[in-house]
Amino acid sequence: MARSLKKGPFADDHLLKKVDEAIAKNSRKPIKTWSRRSTIFPQFVGLTFLVHNGKIFNEVYVTDDMVGHKLGEFSPTRTYHGHGKDKAKK
């Protein structure tokens, strides 16, 4: 279910502060965050985030196509090892 339009998009305050500081300093340093639930705003375009996936931090470079999505969508939490292989054959 989508978020109500009258509520507007969500982003954690501490993340917005870090983004504003990075833009003000014109910093290229990645912004480390655990906030997978935050929506990507247009001001995030061109910045690099280190998004936690529960184990490590994945580097996410934000482009125009990502605006409106969540940061967590670009840092997968599960590892796919493929479907079962035939272990009995040697």
Swiss-Prot record:
Keywords: Ribonucleoprotein, Ribosomal protein, RNA-binding, rRNA-binding. The keyword Ribonucleoprotein applies. Signal peptide: none annotated. The keyword Signal does not apply. One of its GO terms (biological process) is translation. Coiled coil: none annotated. It comes from the Bacteria. It holds the Pfam family Ribosomal_S19. One of its GO terms (cellular component) is cytoplasm. Protein S19 forms a complex with S13 that binds strongly to the 16S ribosomal RNA. This is Small ribosomal subunit protein uS19. It comes from Mesomycoplasma hyopneumoniae (strain 7448).
